[in-house]
Amino acid sequence: MKKIIIFALALIMTGSIQAQDVITLPQPEVSKLSMSLGDALKQRRSMRSFSEQEISLQTLSTILWAACGVSDPKTGKITAPSAINMQDIKVYVCSKDGVCLYNAKANTLTKVSGKDIREAIAGKMQPFAKTAPISLVLVSTKDSDRFPNDKYGAMDAGYVSQNIYLACTALGMKTVARAMMDYDTLKQELNLPETSYLELNHPIGY
């Protein structure tokens, strides 16, 4: 079953399923995040080596939900705090098969590119980052009308980043928050407008 799920994700990302660029994620397994907060905080580490073990779509769904998924469908509240409740952090899921954008409200992944951009995420100084099977790229949106400066996007990215750390710890996985990346290449590959800012990235694996 796990291999089938991974294969389905690969097909979506590479465009092998021509008529469908959106995949509905499995419901997150919140029960898998049952480690106590105290234990998660004690065990949380920044890890910089990863095995070749793939990440299932089910596990990815759980991590994305913990990052900034919808925690209360009635109110639209998400798992991470957000300045002025803008909920502006976009999470791009990057793997060898391409890039997808996470839609928290729909619980879906939308294909953005079929290219492997993990080398640009790693940058020149930290090649270990491109060995992780998946990297999450956190992007904020600048809004000059509501945000007088860029600190609010950085704050929101920090909240999401901590959630990713704690979720990976609870799931027995590895991650590290990084600000180093090839900003110019990534902005081009992700087709980001000038109002978007690359905040952080999280290589994730085992």
Tell me the role of every PLM-derived stretch.
Residues G15-A19:
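Sec/Tat signal peptide C-region and signal peptidase I cleavage site
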Residues V22, P148-D150, Y206:
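A short, structure-level motif marking secondary-structure boundaries and short turns
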Residues I4-M13:
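Sec-dependent N-terminal signal peptides
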Residues R44, I63, V91, I134-L186:
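Small-aliphatic-rich amphipathic alpha-helix that forms the alpha element of a beta-alpha
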Residues Q20-A132:
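N-terminal amphipathic, basic helical "cap/leader" segment at the start of enzyme domains
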Residues N191-Y206:
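A glycine-rich helix N-cap at a beta->alpha junction
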